[in-house]
UniProtKB/Swiss-Prot annotation:
Family: Belongs to the CHZ1 family.
One Pfam family matching this protein: CHZ
Known function: Forms a chaperone-bound H2A.Z-H2B complex that acts as a source for SWR1 complex-dependent H2A to H2A.Z histone replacement in chromatin.
Compositionally biased region (Acidic residues): 34-72, 106-117
UniProt-annotated stretches for the region Disordered: 1-117
Name recorded for this polypeptide: Histone H2A.Z-specific chaperone CHZ1
Cellular localisation: Nucleus
Swiss-Prot/TrEMBL keywords: Chaperone, Nucleus
Length: 117
């Protein structure tokens, strides 16, 4: 004798009944699961907790004042013009005079015609 607990045919029927109860029949091969609202309420509670944490972080940002200790004010151009993209000619007479050089100087290392005995 078998009881309803140990009867294999009874276990199959209860499993298929549970699947049928959790889905809505929409036709052949098209079924939609019934939403489990207990999981959604847990997600909502977590989102509310996350929002509280964000507010605390934003308050900290508001309290901090920006200091310009790292920025050298003398490096800021008063006209607001930018120096990027400006072509500089280092070979012009004006640039050489500013550096204290003349255009005829040669480096000793660059001479390739020097013979060594």
């Amino acid at each position: 004798m078998s009881s309803s607990v140990t009867d294999p045919t009874n276990a199959q029927n209860t499993a298929s009944d549970a699947v049928a109860a959790s889905t809505v029949d929409k036709g052949k091969g098209k079924s939609t699961e019934i939403a489990d609202e207990s999981m959604e309420s847990v997600d909502d509670e977590e989102e509310e907790d996350d929002d509280d944490d964000d507010d605390e972080v934003e308050e900290d940002d508001d309290e901090e004042e920006e200091t310009f200790e790292e920025i050298d004010p003398s490096a800021i151009l008063p006209t607001g013009r930018r120096t990027r993209g400006v072509r500089v000619d280092y070979t012009s007479k004006e640039a050489l005079a500013k550096a204290g050089l003349t255009g005829n100087e040669h480096d000793e290392d660059d001479d390739g015609d020097t013979e060594m005995n």
